[in-house]
């Protein structure tokens, strides 16, 4: 989060970089009568529309039609600042983390000490399903592929909340390292790989047992992770070293690839061929690039120019397009993956951070 996360993490790392991971209608937080789980089936035979979402730290969620790259809806959040966002694997639910906003006269640290929420909406109706209380300063939210759980990192509590995806109730928490932030979950839904920004480690969490089973050292200030669909290779952005760590999960050997300045989020294509790293830089010296890394050769094959403060990143399921939030420009860059060129810049509301596609 631009004004919160890194300034808290500086107590651990002395890092000065700031990481911050108009629609046709505006929705508030009015709950539906029934709270469907992400597993419930819909009797809908119409062709599905693809969307991508941005979590805007100024206080909103932008919903963008992927066929037109136009904002079609905006959800306002008066109670806090959305940080990261994800669509469920079945495409029916969108969830995001919501950290409390500072009140007048409140210190930044005081805001950090307030519990936050995980908020869930129906994708097709834009109706609120449930707002779930989690820990202090929630960072990222990820659904398991099997549809059973939703995990949320709580950066001030040094733990991960586990939410039942059917009932939207918190069922437990796993203790991890210091300052947990971004993470991804293995395709088999067994393990979460959590970047601990206050350390130099990735926590491996056994999801079924709510337990950290291993820590992997990767370097100074890891921000988030990605994992190949075969579960063999883990990647982590190492912000304090301007590198992408690539970890062989059979041997836990770590290799590093130099990327741009201040790497934030990373996303791996569904075919595992390339990984894309959004390089944010700092607010004083923002970066504006995406590094495209060949996962076989472990080399950067191209660097793509985006807007200022490239932060969140996602690739469409067909691997044709890459979407990047530019936190200091208030935009999303749409990149043609075949040409490595930006083909569209979409204006959203202030400080877009996380991004997800359905």
Listing of model-derived features with the role each one plays in the protein:
Residues 7-10, 18-358:
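Predominantly soluble domains enriched in secretory-pathway, periplasmic, or organellar proteins
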């Amino acid at each position: 989060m631009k004004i919160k996360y890194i300034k808290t993490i500086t107590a651990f790392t002395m890092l000065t970089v700031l990481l911050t991971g108009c629609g046709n209608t505006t929705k508030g937080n009015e709950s539906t009568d029934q709270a469907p789980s992400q597993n419930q089936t819909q009797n809908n035979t119409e062709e599905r529309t693809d969307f991508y979402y941005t979590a805007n730290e100024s206080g909103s969620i932008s919903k963008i039609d992927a066929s037109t790259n136009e904002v079609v809806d905006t959800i306002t959040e008066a109670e806090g600042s959305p940080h990261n966002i994800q669509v469920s694997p079945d495409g029916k639910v969108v969830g995001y983390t919501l950290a409390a906003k500072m009140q007048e006269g409140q210190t930044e640290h005081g805001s950090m000490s307030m519990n936050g929420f995980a908020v869930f909406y129906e994708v097709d109706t834009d109706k609120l399903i449930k707002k779930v209380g989690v820990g202090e300063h929630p960072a990222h939210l990820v659904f398991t592929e099997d549809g059973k759980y939703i995990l949320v990192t709580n950066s001030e509590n040094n733990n991960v909340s586990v939410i039942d995806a059917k009932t939207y109730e918190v069922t437990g928490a796993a203790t991890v390292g210091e300052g947990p932030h971004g993470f991804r979950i293995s395709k088999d839904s067994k393990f979460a790989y959590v970047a601990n920004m206050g350390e130099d480690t990735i926590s491996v969490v056994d999801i079924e047992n709510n337990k950290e089973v291993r820590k992997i050292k990767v370097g100074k200030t890891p921000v988030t992770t990605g994992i190949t669909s075969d579960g063999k290779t883990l990647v982590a952005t190492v912000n304090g070293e301007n590198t992408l760590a690539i970890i062989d999960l059979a041997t836990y050997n770590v290799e590093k690839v130099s990327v741009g300045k201040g790497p934030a989020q990373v996303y791996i294509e569904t075919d595992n061929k390339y990984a894309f790293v959004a390089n944010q830089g700092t607010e004083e010296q923002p970066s504006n690039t995406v590094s495209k890394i060949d996962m076989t050769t472990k080399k950067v094959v191209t660097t793509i120019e985006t807007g200022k403060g490239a932060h969140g990143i996602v690739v469409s399921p067909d691997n044709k397009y890459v979407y990047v939030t530019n936190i200091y420009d208030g935009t999303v860059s749409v990149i043609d993956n075949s040409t490595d060129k930006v083909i569209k810049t979409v204006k959203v509301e202030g400080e877009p951070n996380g991004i997800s596609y359905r």
